[in-house]
Amino acid sequence: MSQQGGSFSAQTKEELLHTVPAHDGCIRAEMAAVIQACGSLVLTQRGLHLELISDHPALVRRMFGYCKKMTGQSAQLLVRQNKRLNRRNSYILRLIGRETVLGLLSQLGIWEDGMVQGTPRGLERTCCRRSYIRGLFLCCGSVTNPEKAYHLEWTLKEESLCQDLLALLEKEEISAHAVEFLEGVKEKMLMWPISKKAMAWRRCWR
């Protein structure tokens, strides 16, 4: 599960958030991953809009910049205060407008036949594939300090997304496996622990 604060996971994510995508294809791949992992389509009286929710403000700001670049429109940025003890605030990016939202999803290669698809098109390039893996990690990944105990994982809600990630990691020659578990009473989630040679994970997002 993702950790923030001063943890090694948090430090790793801060480092990754300063990664400059090689080209627009890498931007599309990273953004597609973020939308699939922590985004949702919401239908209201105002129409269709896209919401991204994260407890990492820098990630939301990064996606705000990507949205502006790809759609020419500014998304809304909101903060939701969590009143539970020791819970971080949630940061929300909201892109409004059916035409804008579906146009963006189409550009990202994850909208087809009226629904959000799995792995986006265009991940044949190594840099784009690694950008997609990086986006998933920024949303729902965690890693321990390899100098202490090596462990890297992604916590994902969709089995299809998990299978896609396994296939992408295999292309990176990183061995992984799936572990299914229950969180609370209702929510069923999936987790991918990885044990490999120390620092091998760095190939995933460079």
Task: Please place each PLM-identified region on the residue numbering.
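Sequence-level preference for short, compositionally simple segments enriched
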Residues: M1-E51, D55-L59, L77-N89, R98, ...
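DNA-contacting interfaces and partner/effector-binding or oligomerization modules
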Residues: S54, V60-R61, G65-R206
